[in-house]
């Protein structure tokens, strides 16, 4: 019978060249670079809440790290190390092989080393639980934060919105389904936004709700033009609005930047070959006004909240 430590050695023990000590001891030892601050974020994925039972293991390995990388992107931090904790209903080696393949393929792309974690057998028939903590570095006082937006700043968003939520609602759209299961973290964008953006956040719970976090922390409001939002193509207009504004799981970046920085942002878009769209502006009135093509205010649904009913 395979043991917990056999599983760790076989599927998750990799050389950690940028850590003093990695997997295999009671704790990892890390050495941040001189003049750097540590950015730390944790995300938990729960079966039947964040992914369906039977989800492809390789894609799940990718997504479990990608959502954490997206937090690093939103902070303008360079990802460095991660820990992984799993609560497994059973020791399924085929599943573990696929999961670790997806996890480490993405980790290699972004230079992330797995330096620790834990595995536990959960209740028989119970849900699979995946918890990743990621650590990154950012130069002192250079991190992108949620509390820096100022009146007259422009509001920008990367990529397109709504694909992941549409992929969950309609399984026949393969492109949308891929966006749901294998999101692309905007790490390069986050790093390049240092010195340009005044505030940033990733779109995990829905555009409206996540922009709302910036507004709340910054003590400001916003006017957003719905028709300017970059959207995944969805024929049903009602479903489109729900997916775009409150669907979540897009893992694009919303950021604010001074009104005069448009040329720099557009140059950055060209350099990264990434769509960056100006969608509104920050104001002093502390609310979010979403306007339709005729300038009428739209009702905006809240995004995802684990404890709302």
What are these regions (language model features)?
Residues 1-309:
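Helix-biased detector of long, well-ordered alpha-helical tracts
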């Amino acid at each position: 019978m395979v043991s917990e430590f056999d599983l760790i050695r076989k599927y998750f023990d990799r050389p950690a060249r940028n850590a003093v000590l990695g997997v295999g001891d009671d704790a990892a030892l890390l050495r941040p670079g001189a003049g750097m601050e540590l950015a730390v974020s944790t995300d938990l994925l729960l079966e039947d809440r964040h992914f369906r039972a039977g989800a492809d293991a390789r894609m799940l390995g990718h997504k479990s790290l990608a959502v954490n990388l997206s937090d690093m992107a939103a902070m303008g931090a360079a990802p460095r190390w991660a820990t992984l904790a799993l609560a497994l209903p059973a020791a399924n080696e085929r599943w573990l092989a696929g999961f670790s393949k997806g996890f480490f393929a993405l980790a290699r792309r972004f230079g992330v080393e797995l330096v620790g974690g834990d595995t536990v057998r959960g209740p028989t028939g119970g849900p699979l639980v995946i918890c990743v903590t990621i650590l990154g570095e950012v130069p002192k006082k250079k991190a992108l934060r949620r509390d820096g937006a100022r009146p007259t700043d422009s509001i920008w968003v990367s990529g397109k919105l709504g694909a992941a939520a549409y992929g969950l609602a309609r399984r026949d759209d393969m492109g949308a389904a891929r966006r749901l299961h294998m999101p692309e973290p905007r790490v390069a964008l986050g790093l390049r936004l240092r010195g340009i953006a005044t505030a940033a956040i990733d779109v995990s719970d829905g555009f409206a709700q996540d922009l709302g976090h910036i507004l709340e922390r910054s003590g400001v409001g916003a006017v957003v033009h719905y028709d300017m939002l970059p959207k995944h193509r969805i024929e049903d207009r009602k479903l489109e609005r729900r997916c775009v504004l409150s669907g979540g799981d897009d893992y694009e970046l919303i950021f604010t930047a001074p009104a005069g920085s448009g040329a720099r942002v557009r140059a950055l878009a060209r350099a990264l070959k990434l769509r960056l769209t100006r969608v509104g502006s920050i104001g002093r009135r502390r609310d979010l006004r979403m306007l339709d093509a005729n300038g009428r205010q739209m009702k905006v649904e809240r995004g995802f909240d684990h404890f709302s009913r």
